[in-house]
């Protein structure tokens, strides 16, 4: 059974954006508390909990969910922790937003675990591949010197290749694909009504050729060019809007609980507002039908 693309009101778009921003921001803060492990030349750490934005971009409007997640990472994971790299942050912002947006577009049937799995892997893969290309480019163009890793060949391709594989296993599979395959079927049809949004039924009528148009490809390539240039400039110390205040150090490691509390309060507030909004819409429809 086909369906038309879901139409969102401005309030619904804002709620999806804030929900994604606060939830992924909160998740990023918790990853800061998790330990890192080193096995030989390989560093094992959780860069981000990919299943959260992946779940949101598949259940809701991909653009607002992806954009909200990227903003949440910057606000709660960088700015409030005093670790904002200025212009250099633009690279990660563009790459992650683009990757999650494409992942959301790839899913046309939320009842298909195969589609969910492919979209989840492709989303994280795009993010990691774009980041790898930029890192390799910085060394090849002589902008940054190669930092040799003991136990690995002194080759940027080998170093970045190992990093790419570990990120795909940890962020892509363990904390991306597996949780998403479990959560999406559980949440599908239950969380959307909270925002007054009709759950997606069947397949979207628009084909991938309509989504991935020439215009979309041109914009994506242009954004990647901007991301690469911004990272190159930041590496060459041509940077601005950096926010790394020294006074935050006096609060010690316990300071992280302040942004965690802020993100949690925003998330709970959005959920409460969404429930009230849904109830008011239901009440209005009931009165009209009566």
PLM region spans:
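Short, charged juxtamembrane terminal tails flanking transmembrane helices
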Residues: 1-7, 201, 280-290
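Hydrophobic transmembrane alpha-helices
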Residues: 2-60, 64-65
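Hydrophobic alpha-helical transmembrane segments
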Residues: 14, 18-22, 63, 67-71, ...
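Alpha-helical transmembrane segments and their immediate juxtamembrane interface regions
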Residues: 23, 247-282
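Interfacial aromatic-anchored transmembrane helix boundaries in multi-pass membrane proteins
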Residues: 30-43, 72-104
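Membrane-embedded alpha-helical hairpins and interfacial helices in multi-pass inner-membrane proteins
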Residues: 33-45, 109-262
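Membrane-helix interface "capping/anchor" motifs
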Residues: 56-69, 108-115
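Membrane-interface capping segments at transmembrane-helix boundaries
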Residues: 186-194, 273-286
